[in-house]
Structure formats: C-alpha cells, structure tokens
C-alpha cells in the first residue's frame, strides 16, 4: 500500500511539473502535450493574465484552467474564446455554479468566429478542457485564444454571446435591437462602403463609413478625418451573405480580440421607428441619442 501511494504521489507530481513546464514566461499562455498525461487524469493550470492562448497537443484526459488568477472577482466578467486553428481532439466548457458545465468550443469547430459567456460575481473563472476519445493516434491540436474582462452591464445581449456562431445571421428582434443599442461596444450610424470576403477564415469584412458615432468603447472610428467622416472594418460570418447596398444603417456590435464584430445592423429608419415606439411606451432600456 505504501509503495502504491508513493507511486501515485510521484505520478501527480510529474503531471503538475509537466503542466508547469508549458507556461509562457509571463504565465499568460500555456503549451503542452497529452502524451505525458495519465488517461483519466485532470491537469491543473492557472493563467494570471486576462489575455492569452492555449495549445494542447495530442489531448488526453482533461485540463482545468483558471483564468485571471486564482481568486474570483467581485464583478461579473465575460470570457471569449476563439480557435487559432481548426479545433481537434477536445471540447472546452466553462464552469458554472453548482459544478455545471457550459459548452464553449466543440471538436471540429473551424476558425470562423468564437464564443463568449458571462460569469456572475464570485463565480470562479475556470474552463474545463476534456479530450475526446479517438481510436487512432494521429496528431490533433486543441488551440485557442482567450480574453477576459469585467462587465458592468446589467445583462448580456444574446448577440454578444457568439461572434461567428449559429444564429449570427438571424435578424435581430425589436427587443434585441433595443438591448444591443444599450449594451454593445459601438453604435454607429453609417453606410456600407464595401465588403471583402475572406474564404480562409470564412468571414466577411465590411468597410463602414460613419455618418455619426453615437457611442464606442474602443477606438474604432477616428472622427475628424479630412472628409469629416471615419471608416472602419466590421466583421461578420461569410455565410451571412453581406453585400454592399444603398441606404444608411445603425451598426452595433462588440470588440473581440481587437476586432469589431457585428451584432445587429438595422436600417436607420427601422431602428428609429422601434426606438420611438419603445420611448412612447416607456419601455426603452436606455436613451439613444439619434438626433
């Protein structure tokens, strides 16, 4: 029994040492291999930064990843994940209250877009990476970027939870338009100058000309250009089929990994109608300066 206990402790120590060896110097990222991990074991990782990357080669067993240090914050926070290559060999879940798990990245997910979710106050910022079983030993890599930031908003719009996931091309309802206008990182009244399609990333890049910057929390549009208008790129899924067209729109969305991602883009007159009706009925969640 003593020998078995010593062997078990030695194995656990080797697993912990192997995990520690994969950290980057600033402990913001980790790279390691499942070939050194015992089947059925769970490696423990802690990354101290709010931005970083994970690369898990030949996934085996599972990893538990704590983000932003070991202490949970007192404010809600949003975590976003994006594959850095076709995601293979594992699934990524977010830990929720009472030990529940929420799927964020599934095996086979391509490079297009990613997924975000919101942790409440005092929820531990932890991800659970679980290897998926395969009969062969071909090279598989589960690699993704992450970003974590505090969120002071009362609630998270459904459009903010996924950038490049199923439902991203669905038109926003009236209620979603109003909520997105209040919670998004940018609200821009403008026109479509052009659209470029990236076949490799399966994304469309929309060049937006701003008539008016209503709100932005990131330096997306630089006001005061020579023409008095700013241009910026906003991304969406290729399969959404965005094309250049006439008319003015209200572009609303979020900053993800330093890029602007589209949430809702109603025609400006349509949003004005929805907002005016909500204002008259005292149902507007916030004030939007359209004039």
UniProtKB/Swiss-Prot annotation:
Gene Ontology MF: a single term: hormone activity
Disulfide bond positions: 28-49, 80-116, 169-240, 172-264, 182-286
4Fe-4S listed as a keyword: no
Listed InterPro entries: Meteorin-like
Family: Belongs to the meteorin family.
PANTHER family: METEORIN, METEORIN-LIKE PROTEIN
This protein's name: Meteorin
């Amino acid at each position: 029994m003593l020998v078995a206990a010593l062997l078990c402790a030695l194995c656990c120590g080797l697993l912990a040492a192997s995990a520690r060896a994969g950290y980057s110097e600033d402990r913001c990222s980790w790279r390691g291999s499942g070939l050194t991990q015992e089947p059925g074991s769970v490696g423990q990782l802690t990354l101290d930064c709010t931005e970083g990357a994970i690369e898990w080669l030949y996934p085996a067993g599972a990893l538990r990843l704590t983000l932003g240090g070991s202490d949970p914050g007192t404010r809600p926070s949003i975590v976003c994940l994006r594959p850095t290559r076709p995601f293979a060999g594992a699934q990524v879940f977010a830990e929720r209250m009472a030990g529940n798990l929420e799927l964020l990245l599934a095996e086979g997910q391509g490079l297009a877009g990613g997924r975000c979710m919101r942790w409440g106050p005092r929820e531990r910022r932890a991800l659970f990476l679980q290897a998926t079983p395969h009969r062969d030993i071909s090279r598989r890599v589960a690699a993704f970027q992450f970003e974590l930031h505090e969120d002071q908003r009362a609630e998270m719009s459904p459009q903010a939870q996924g950038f490049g996931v199923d439902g991203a091309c669905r038109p926003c309802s009236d209620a979603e338009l109003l909520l997105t206008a209040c919670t998004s990182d940018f609200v821009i009244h403008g026109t479509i100058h052009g659209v470029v399609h990236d076949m490799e990333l399966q994304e469309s890049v929309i060049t937006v000309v701003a008539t008016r910057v209503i709100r932005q929390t990131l330096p997306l549009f630089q006001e005061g250009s020579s023409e008095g208008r700013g241009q910026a790129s906003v991304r969406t899924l290729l399969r959404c089929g965005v094309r250049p067209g006439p008319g003015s729109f209200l572009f609303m969305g979020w900053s993800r990994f330093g890029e602007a991602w589209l949430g809702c883009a109603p025609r400006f007159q349509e949003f004005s109608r929805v907002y005016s009706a909500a204002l008259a009925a005292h149902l507007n969640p916030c004030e939007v300066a359209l004039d």
